[in-house]
């Protein structure tokens, strides 16, 4: 199995509070099952707020209920209360990965950066060299996108 991504994929860095937009507003931030379990078992002052804002939609997906179209953990300075308080490893997969995306196809995994992110778009448009894609062989024994990451529940507990 091969993994293919733009050659500058790993160079992306979120500019967080300096971003002209926020990825923490105007869309449903889905909470993956591992994060949900960790949030429900969390023993921290922030746990009560986490439990209060998690909702389940008609499809059975858990998400953070927005407040005025914004994530309830988005602070006035544009930074995330969860990340600030519990660390980056505490973020649900949606927040941890965006603007990165990953698609598992029959014989390969394709990765990229969403141009919905102003910094990812700026990085692409600022290129002077042609865009190239890098493919590397990866183990194909039951590969699941994101499985290389440490389990969130292990980090929070």
Kindly give the residue locations of the regions a language model identified.
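Short loop/turn segments that flank or connect secondary-structure elements
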Residues: 1-49, 55-69, 75-157
